[in-house]
């Protein structure tokens, strides 16, 4: 009802334009810069309100139908802005003018010198000042995994011999794994946690998140040798192989959070349900281990997690007794039974677009995991996905953006070229097949020719002969 009212208001007072950020990352980038300039940060879904001349004066991220938890509601916002437009239009136009002037100034800004290590040290200090020592991650709720930040900290800690940086990354990686943001039954990570403990996720799973998280966990395994990290990476890639891989080799974008119209329904359990699948004894033990309780932790049911279990296996390299090893194998068997049971539920909708940029990240993750973990099947996944892109998303020496149901569309953007080149370089490092290096070099030349600004430096998001 709330959204119906909002729809009525939108159609009466506004002209609505919906942008698919996956197909038009260039348009998304323009308006994300507006949001970041106005609010200091951005996010999705992104809401922009503009004048008829397309000059933005409001920006925000997620808006609930009605105000709650101190957050303005969509319905109230639409009413207020429409009223201001009628009675105080000059104020809104002034706001639009200020943000436009700021963005033009930023566009003209030039860098006087190459960035140095001072900037890198500053980034580390910023992370250290914002680190959640108890739960891992940075800041409060909602919490995003930000694997790129964790990879930076691991690299910085290694190069600068800064143990604090490595500790921040490791605490975060462990706590995310223990939380409900990680799917302990089916593998893979959800987009973000609604709470600071990583317990209750927004249940949508995205390919790019899981690609970068796989890279982070593989990197942590390479640094420490702790099997926990290697095991999480394996579960991520097992999930991608089972749920997000096209029969021809490409990787799908992700899975929705809802089934039967209810967010998270696919992922939660009751103790009775667990015991019915596993039997009373095994079911009770599983519930104790994974926090499945009668009162639940999410709308009366439970998201499996290890946050309350201090005895979880953290490092198999420490060695197991025969009894402990048998218990571990039993847990794996229980997880498989629950996975097969869960498959009988109403399946989650898949976004079956295949994007060059996101596939590039996942190819990198699979190839690197194959090399570091010694699993050739992951390299095979990467090889097949690269072949899919080469066959279906490269035309006349240029890349496309996406493929779906036999149709490739969209002029490739900068991130498509950059991510695909990274994928080719990673495949070369892993396989030593020179064809990958040759293709990476050729695509890099095309990227420089089409996107590089030879006067001021830097790369444009769209090609010089693009729209």
Describe these PLM feature segments:
Residues 189, 193, 370-380, 394-408:
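Glycine-rich cofactor-pocket loops
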Residues 1-365, 369-372:
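Replace the tail clause
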């Amino acid at each position: 009802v709330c959204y119906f009212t909002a729809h009525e208001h939108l159609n009466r007072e506004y002209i609505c334009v919906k942008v698919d950020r996956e197909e038009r990352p260039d348009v998304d980038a323009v308006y994300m810069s507006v949001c970041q300039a106005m609010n200091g940060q951005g996010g999705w879904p992104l809401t922009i309100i503009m004048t008829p001349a397309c000059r933005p004066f409001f920006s925000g991220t997620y808006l609930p139908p009605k105000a709650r938890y101190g957050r303005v509601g969509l319905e109230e916002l639409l009413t207020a802005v429409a009223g201001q437009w009628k009675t105080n239009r000059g104020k809104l136009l002034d706001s639009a003018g200020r943000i436009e002037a700021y963005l033009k100034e930023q566009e003209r800004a030039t860098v006087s010198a190459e960035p140095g290590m001072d900037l890198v040290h500053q980034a580390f200090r910023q992370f250290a000042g914002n680190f959640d020592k108890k739960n891992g991650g940075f800041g409060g709720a909602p919490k995003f995994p930000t694997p790129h930040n964790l990879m930076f900290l691991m690299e910085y800690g290694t190069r600068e011999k800064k143990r604090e940086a490595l500790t921040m990354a490791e605490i975060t990686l462990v706590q995310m794994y223990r939380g409900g943001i990680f799917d302990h039954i089916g593998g893979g990570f959800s987009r973000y946690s609604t709470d600071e403990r990583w317990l209750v996720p927004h249940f949508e799973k995205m390919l790019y998140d899981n690609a970068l998280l796989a890279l982070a966990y593989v990197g942590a395994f390479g640094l420490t040798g702790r099997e926990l990290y290697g095991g999480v990476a394996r579960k991520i890639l097992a999930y991608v192989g089972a749920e997000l891989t096209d029969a021809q080799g490409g990787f799908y974008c992700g899975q929705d959070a809802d089934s039967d119209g209810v967010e998270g329904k696919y992922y939660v359990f009751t103790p009775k349900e667990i015991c019915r699948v596993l039997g009373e004894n095994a079911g009770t033990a599983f519930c104790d281990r994974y926090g499945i309780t009668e009162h639940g932790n999410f709308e009366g049911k439970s998201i499996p997690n290890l946050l309350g279990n201090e005895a979880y296996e953290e490092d198999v390299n420490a060695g197991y007794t025969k009894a402990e090893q048998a218990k571990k194998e039993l847990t794996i068997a229980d997880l498989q039974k629950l996975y097969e049971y869960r498959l009988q539920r109403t399946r989650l909708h898949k976004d079956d677009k295949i994007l060059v940029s996101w596939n590039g990240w996942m190819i990198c993750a699979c190839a690197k995991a194959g090399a570091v973990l010694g699993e050739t099947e992951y390299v095979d996944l990467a090889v097949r996905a690269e072949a899919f892109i080469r066959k279906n998303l490269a035309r006349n020496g240029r890349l496309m953006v996406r493929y779906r149901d036999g149709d490739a569309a969209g002029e490739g953007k900068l991130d498509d070229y950059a991510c695909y080149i990274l994928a080719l370089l990673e495949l070369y490092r892993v396989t030593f097949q020179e064809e990958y290096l040759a293709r990476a070099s050729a695509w890099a030349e095309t990227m420089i020719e089409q996107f590089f600004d030879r006067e001021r430096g830097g790369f444009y998001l769209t090609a010089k002969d693009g729209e």
